[in-house]
Amino acid sequence: YLPQEFGFYPNLSVKKYLAYIASLKGLKNKVAERRIDILLETTGMKEHSLKKMKELSGGMKRRVGIAQALLNDPKILILDEPTAGLDPIERIKCRNLLGELAKGKIVLLSTHIVSDIEAIAKKVFVMKEGKIIKEGTVEELCSNIPCKVWLYYLNTDEAEGFISRFKS
């Protein structure tokens, strides 16, 4: 499980934090060490493994969160707003990583960002009050709910003006 905001001990290194979480999940030391090494490599955090958690950027913390969610190799991965608060570049990196790591798993994803869903899921189920109300690909779902989803492509020159309209 990857909550939108997860707690961590700020003075623990990335590696020690993951070892601590692995012990809470009941992983044996040797198994935990192997999984941590694999996940540090996979998430691109190997070179930062000795940094303290408080020294990490938002994107790095999110990657550590993904690693902790995958420590015990779950069959079902629950992600709550996995790219919330990330800048556009980190958002793309994060969802590409999740797309790779989610292969062969059931992923329950809570997000309001359609592009995150597109990058991670082949088939989407929309739930309301615990019941499935729609299912299909992102494209199918978006075409079936006109006036609810908008997609607009900006060139670099337009982006600044567009973004400034939404700043307070």
Features from the language model and the residues they span:
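Hydrophobic anchor residue at the start of the ABC signature
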Residues: 66
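Conserved ABC ATPase signature
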Residues: 52-56
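Conserved ABC ATPase "signature" region
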Residues: 19, 23, 30-48
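Catalytic Walker B motif of ABC-type/P-loop ATPase nucleotide-binding domains
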Residues: 77-80
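ABC ATPase "signature
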Residues: 135-136
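Conserved catalytic motifs of ABC-family nucleotide-binding domains
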Residues: 73
